Each structure stands twice: as structure tokens, then as C-alpha cells.
Amino acid sequence: MASSTSLQHFAPPARASTRREPARRRLTVMAAVTPATEAAAAGVAEERLEPRVEEREGGYWVLKEKYREGINPQEKVKLAKEPMSLVLEDGIRDLAAKSMEEIDASKVHKDDIDVRLKWLGLFHRRKHQCESLRSPSLYRSYGRFMMRLKLPNGVTTSEQTRYLASVVEGYGKDGCADVTTRQNWQIRGVTLPDVPAIMQGLDRVGLTSLQSGMDNVRNPVGNPLAGIDPHEIVDTRPYTNLLSAFVTANSRGNLAFTNLPRKWNVCVVGSHDLYEHPHINDLAYMPTIKDGRFGFNLLVGGFFSPKRCAEAVPLDAWVPSDDVIPVCKAILEAYRDLGTRGNRQKTRMMWLIDELVSFSSSSLLLPDL
């Protein structure tokens, strides 16, 4: 499925205006649009739609040489060593056998290993280490990690919760757990030597921490009252489970989507209450009926950050419920292939949508599903 067609035409169809433009304005437009300028614009658009990444041996996706100028530091870390090799090539066991001092001494630069560990859901709070010299209470954070899981729709079993509690309890005062705004678990106080055993334990109870941080698809969010909401339109749990299984290849790690330009959020809306906050998700599935068939309208591009808050926009497309995964795949491939990788403040998917809309005023062309 060619991703260049997935986001190639984001703008809705141009609508003929009944308002008559002033003569001077009409003449200016006519003079500006010539065959030469049309050809130039088409050439720019065609070049821009060339995928910027390519698949390499082992299934890893790598940024092409010609697109590496001006990339951000995180992209340089990914180029230097594939983060998922920590899992697929058992690199985490090698790291776990080293002291933090040995790990720090082996770094190419101060953030490389800390960044790559986020693909395993491990977050080392480096800034606290700098403060620890002045504040002894913060020194405990050195060598300790927060571990973020994947918990689609926020559904957890008693067995899973007991296991996480046992992990946290083992760290005494340094251990604690968070419930996140994306319906997820985070456990704190984890030390690197314990990680291989913790990951094995997660697998035994049906959990994973893979692809939960950095430039990956984050935890799929659904209705927190799924299955018991009296105003429920659709039970979101089957769909969020499907999305999580697809994104992580059933917790084995899905290399097709471990090198996105930035993080990517997805949700499935279950009721009119909009608990899932679809307006701030990169892809939101909005339940609706069309011609007697259940499916979803799509919203895309929503996010908020200190630099910009962008509300998701309607894709003006309806998909049947059977196509939830193919649509997600097509949009992720397009974002992976076409998204910019320079200024981290301008690499979320909405920036790509803005750019592609400026190239086209045609209607959306979804790939064959």
C-alpha cells in the first residue's frame, strides 16, 4: 500500500463560490497561474511526496541519507543505533549487567542510551541527576527509571495489578505507581538490573512496555465506562485492543512503526460524552452509522504542546468498522514516510497535514482497503 497516496490529498474538495470577486483580484489570479507555475508547483508536490525513510535489513526503517541534514538530536540517536535492538537483539540484558557509571562512560553523548531506552518504556530522569548535587532527596532518582506500560482502554486485571504492586513494593519508598491521562500504568523506582525479569513478568500476565515512549504510538484510549455506560454508542474495548495488538505486533515489537517522526496518539470514541478527548488525538475514530452500516468518521491531527494547540480536523471520510486497522496503518505509514524530522516542535502530524493541504485542494483519496 503506497503511503504517498494516504495523506496526499488532505484538503476537502474546492467549492465553487457564488461570490463574485473584484475584477482586479480576478486578473491578478489569472496572471499568476501560468502553465510554467503549475508545472513547478506539481514538481514540488511530487518531490515532497517521496518517502523519506526506507526499510533496511532486519526490518528496521531508516531515514534516507539525502534527508539527514538538519535533523534533530533524537533522530541522530536513532540513526546511530536502532532503539528496538535493545529488545530484538537482547541489548537490554547487556545494559542490565552494567553499572550506571559504566553505562554513562560508554555513551556517545549524554542522552543516547536514555533516549533509546524509552522504546522499552523506560524513562531515566536525567535532569534530576543534575539537581541531586544540591538536593540529596533527588539523588535517589539516579539509576532509577519510570516504566510506562501499554494498557489499551485502561483495562487491567486483578492478576496484572497484583504483579505491578509486587514490583513497586520491592523498591520500598522509591517505588510508586501512576495512573496516566491516557488510561495507563506507570511504575517508578525501577532499576536497570531488574528490567529483564520485570519484562518477563509483564509478559506472563499479558502486559508489555514496548513502544510506549518517544516516537511511537501511545496507549490507545477508549471510553472509561466501556461496557457499562448506559449512553454507550459502541464498546470501545475490542477496537483499542486491536489497535494495541497491531501497533506492537502482539507485544513482540512492530518495526514498521518504531521510527515515527514524533509520538502519535489514537483514540476510539464510545459515547457523546467524549471522555477520550478526540480533539487532541492524532487519529480519532468517531462512531456513526452510514447507509445502515456501523463505522467511524475520522478526525486527524489533534495535539497540544507549549508551542501550539491544534484541534483535530475532520478527514471528511467514513470507514466501516472492519477497516479500523487498515486505515490506522495507512495513516501511520504516511506519517512515518513523509513527516519532517527537524525542529521537534514542528514534527507532530498536524504540521504534515498543514503542509500537504497547502499542496492540494483536491478531495481525500484513501488507499484501497
Model-derived regions, located:
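Peripheral terminal and linker regions in Fe-S/redox and tRNA-modifying enzymes
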Residues: 4, 21-369
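Long, distal/terminal scaffolding or interaction modules
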Residues: 9-12
